[in-house]
Amino acid sequence: MTVASHKETLGFQTEVKQLLNLMIHALYSNKEIFLRELISNGADAADKLRFEALTDDALYEDDSALHIRLSYDKDKRTLTIADNGIGMGRQEVVENIGTIAKSGTRAFLESLSGDQAKDARLIGQFGVGFYSAFIVADKVVLETRRAGFGPEHGVRWESGGAGDYTIETIEKATRGTVVTLHLREGEDEFLDGWRLRHIVTRYSDHIDLPIEIKREIGDEEKSEENGEEWEQINKATALWTLPKNDIKEEEYQAFYKHVAHDFEDPLAWTHNRVEGKLEYTSLLFIPPRAPFDLWERDRTQGIKLYVQRVFIMDDTEQLMPRYLRFVRGVVDSNDLPLNISREILQNNRVIDSIRAGSVKKILGLLEDMAKHEAKKYQSFWKEFGQVMKEGVGEDSGNREQIARLLRFASTHHDTAEQTVSLADYLSRMKEGQDKIYYITADSFPAAKSSPHLEVFRKKGIEVLLLSDRVDEWLVASLPEFEGKSLQSVTKGELDLGHLEDEQEKQQQKEVEEDFQNLVERVKNNLGDKVKEVRVTHRLTDSPVCLVVEQHDMSGYLERLLKEAGQQAPHIQPILELNPAHPIIARLKGEESEENFGDWAHLLFEQALLAEGGRLEEPALFVKRLNSLLLAMAD
């Protein structure tokens, strides 16, 4: 079969067309990053070749000096980026360039807002890679051959970045990938050797293989002196292997942008070298913003694993727990075998030790930030707070340290901003208070306006206002903090302990006896809708509220589980009556059993709505309400 018969024209995946169009406009103000992305691809290809060559040295094809080379032609207006890494076969080209085989693609596209600055950050997080070439080029030609394939298995891919591309089989003598950009009008700056040198130095100086540029005619004398046609323009040293004192802040920031495909500087980082029984180096970064796919369960992790400076694998989930899945960086170990697999990683003492040490470093970094850079920590919490809350249940060994990092909204500020630490709460506890009080709800306004808070507000007792979906699991995993138990204000009988005097307790007992008959009448009318009816002193303004037993599932958690499609037992609530409320006083004197029944059901349904619950029969609720309104009007 001839080479020509292998040529075909294929259409881009719909998402690719959308991404190309959005990217060209959103990233144009930061267009030089295309070179960083294409160089990064070349570096990844070299890493993959090194790894595969560990078990098959023949893949080097007698050329183990890996590099990336830049060249340009001012007459043809082309810029070429070439590497001698692993290369690609025909099917790999189709899969890697014609489609986006990435979960969350649709969610990503939907999250784009039209705001160029915001969209640029999101596109960077998504990883534009090869597609960034179309920011400055109106035609891109890629020629590649996979290491180990014969010269006749070369592939040429070509596209103008519109709806389709052509792909054909070609002869290619050398392995690796060559990307040639036919630059758009007005992009002549990328045909300037000094401009290219500047971009490489700024974005890719840390890439640990040589990036070379073809000497210009003006450099002819230098070329004749040393006999070299190519000039290396980067340091080509793995940044994490250098002493911390030798690395500039700008170099750390540039390296972060490389590993995270981000446009912004990292929020913080920690660089550590461990020596002794176990030897490894870690360079870990906290991003400034949460990625769009933070809540995708199958999203990739952000840690690259190296063994003795040889890249082994991306997305090493064993190196960082899920609640720290936003961390980016590298880990380089001297104690793992070069041929380690993902299966071996799952039960490996070295990996377990590296993971434990890395987690300690990240938590320590965050603790230091919270203590000394409160504003920066608040920025971190706004982006990653909900994920950090998962750690309380996932990481029992570090639970206390994570608990110190938690931030909540509370009645102290009465704003939705989560700024209150548990230590802050303890420092403001009333004399005689022995519990940390909280309420969970499906929104901040619902938590803030809950009738369960009325007596706490009256007595000036602070209550944490929890409205994140993860909060129910958080409090279930955190029974106490520094000796003080956490207590839901919607569970069990209210016992304020030493915060109430004996006279108050005696008055409450007398009121309960006085309302015993009313309590029994309400229970008889409501039947199985409630587990119990009782008088309460937790209310000051509302007539009723619903609570559950101390160890029962809250109504909010029950709703969360059902929304997630999980089975949840129905918990019978307890209806509590406020004896000081005029409606309850009127109900006490109601002689008509029909009206009494309507009032009892209406109050129960009102309490259910107040805590975010749903009515089983909304039409019946409206009918009762209208009936009672008419009776009152008469």
Curated annotation (Swiss-Prot):
Keywords: ATP-binding, Chaperone, Cytoplasm, Nucleotide-binding, Stress response
Single GO cellular component term: cytoplasm
Cellular localisation: Cytoplasm
Region (C) residue spans: 560-634
An example molecular function term from Gene Ontology annotations: unfolded protein binding
Alphabetical list of Pfam families matching this protein: HATPase_c_3, HSP90
Primary location class: cytoplasm
Lineage: superkingdom: Bacteria
Region (A): 1-342
Chain spans, region B: 343-559
Homology family: Belongs to the heat shock protein 90 family.
Subunit structure: Homodimer.
Functional description taken from the UniProt entry: Molecular chaperone. Has ATPase activity.
Name of the protein: Chaperone protein HtpG
Originating organism: Nitrosococcus oceani (strain ATCC 19707 / BCRC 17464 / JCM 30415 / NCIMB 11848 / C-107)
Gene this protein is translated from: htpG
